[in-house]
């Protein structure tokens, strides 16, 4: 089946705005303030999309961040929105940066999109300075065994990669990350779903529009698989252990 990048669909930005995720900037703000990030720190936005968080950080904290994303369409919008920022085309499993390049890495509803999460986590660890911070906001499955049915879906969305939180925590700690915060934020996902239903009439209609191409798996089937997993949303803040390895 032909894959469909739901993030390039107009209906996604219509309902989520430029952030393309639940909660807008609420968790971005919380992560930045918890980690005491300042304008002196080097920041990477992993899966920057249209550059929403990079613009937010600059406008509210005078912070300059680097963004990386595989979508040239979204990067084009990002460069228009934030002309002074640096944006690169790429994926998380091969970050084009030297070791110890950043103090803070953001992955806001993007880690679930990575083709190889294990390799991406190793790359994040590599480019982070010792003691550097890794902030993740993303979707997870309360019934992770059901999530395997989504992996082969051609609909490119974070929902395709719902996390198993226990596995994610183990992967991070095995790499020498210390998990400082793990907070359930499923209310933000519910809030977004209510907004979608109000605007589109149902989640089925929304996913059918987001899937777009007729050669894609129908949004209705995709939504049925999502419901079986009982999705939630979380904030996790980790720190690279300077004594690891």
Which positions does each model-derived feature cover?
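Class I SAM-dependent methyltransferase SAM/SAH-binding core
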Residues: 44, 50-94
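A short acidic, Gly/Pro-enriched loop at the edge of an enzyme's catalytic core
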Residues: 93-104
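A short SAM/SAH-binding and catalytic strip from SAM-dependent methyltransferases
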Residues: 104-116
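Short alpha-helix
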Residues: 160-176
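Conserved Class I S-adenosyl-L-methionine
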Residues: 181-245
């Amino acid at each position: 089946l032909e894959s469909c990048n739901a993030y390039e669909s107009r209906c996604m930005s219509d309902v989520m705005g430029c952030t393309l995720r639940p909660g807008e900037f609420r968790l971005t703000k919380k992560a930045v303030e918890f980690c005491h990030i300042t304008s002196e720190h080097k920041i990477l936005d992993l899966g920057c999309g249209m550059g929403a968080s990079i613009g937010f950080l600059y406008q509210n904290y005078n912070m300059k961040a680097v963004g990386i994303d595989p979508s040239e369409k979204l990067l084009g919008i990002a460069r228009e929105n934030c002309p002074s920022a640096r944006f690169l085309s790429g994926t998380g499993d091969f970050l084009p940066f030297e070791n110890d390049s950043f103090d803070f890495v953001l992955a806001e509803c993007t880690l679930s999109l990575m083709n190889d999460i294990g390799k991406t986590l190793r790359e994040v660890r590599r480019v982070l300075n010792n003691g550097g911070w890794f902030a993740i906001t993303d979707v997870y499955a309360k019934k992770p065994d059901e999530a395997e049915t989504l992996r082969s879906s051609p609909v490119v969305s974070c929902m395709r990669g719902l996390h198993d939180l226990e596995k994610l925590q183990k992967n991070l700690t095995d790499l020498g990350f210390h998990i400082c915060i793990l907070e359930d934020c499923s209310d933000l996902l519910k809030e977004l779903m209510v907004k979608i239903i109000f605007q589109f009439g149902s989640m089925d209609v929304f996913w059918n529009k987001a899937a777009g191409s007729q050669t894609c798996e129908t949004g209705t089937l995709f939504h049925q698989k999502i419901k079986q997993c009982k999705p939630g949303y979380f904030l996790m803040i980790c720190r690279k252990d300077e004594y690891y390895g």
